Amino acid sequence: MFSNAFTDKTVMAELVAKMLWEIKAVHFRADEPYKLSSGMASPVYIDCRKLISYPRIRSAVMDFAAATILRDAGFEQFDVVAGGETAGIPFAAMLAERLGLPMIYVRKAPKGHGRNAQIEGHMPEGARVLVIEDLTTAGGSMFKFIDAIRAAGGIVEHGIALFYYDIFPEARGNMKSKGVDLHYIATWRNVLAVAREQALFDEKTLNEVEAFLNAPLAWSERNGGVGTLAAQ
């Protein structure tokens, strides 16, 4: 169960950013941009899955996730924690343990044989479900799982991402318009702040990353990626 240590939000964000650098889960590469699944060119890349391999770090991050949810959403607002296939599953298990709640996981699509189930585990009709993902950009992937839970009779009004890109100002509003409040611990701006503080890169690289965070689609288009995104 959660230890009830409610660390300040800004401290949590900075610590998670430092942890991500420590385990080399975040990368800056402005001169040879990454190509994201959306088609965007990006000077930044993150692999939150690495967190599960570092017990002390993953424990701290999940304590922060529990604190974020309890403080921002409430103590008695959920009946079930859900993780999306596949990255969200281990984090859902760890968060459910801390919150003292049952856990389910949601497939990207029904498995196509047997019960043809998309949701694994027990979710009562009308259950209030907290959905967790390792990261989200604009919430699109999270809604694939939310829609499946709602179709099966669950109620989803909150989602949490351990890491939120926070590069599209309209993203949280779009999620809110679909009935979901998004909670998160750290963003790219926290990661950039740590990189500047620790002088991890030259000034040109840091400035390119900041330019991307300020205008991601314009930066993408200038660097060979798409300049618009498909509607979420």
Curated annotation (Swiss-Prot):
Residues reported to bind 5-phospho-alpha-D-ribose 1-diphosphate: R107, K108, K111, H113, E133, D134, L135, T136, T137, A138, G139, G140, S141
EC number annotated for this UniProt entry: 2.4.2.10
CC cofactor: Mg(2+)
Keywords on record: Glycosyltransferase, Magnesium, Pyrimidine biosynthesis, Transferase
One family name in Pfam for this protein: Pribosyltran
Reactions this protein catalyses: orotidine 5'-phosphate + diphosphate = orotate + 5-phospho-alpha-D-ribose 1-diphosphate
InterPro entries per record: OPRT, Or_phspho_trans_dom, PRibTrfase_dom, PRTase-like
Disulfide bonds: none
Protein name (record): Orotate phosphoribosyltransferase
Gene name, Swiss-Prot/TrEMBL: pyrE
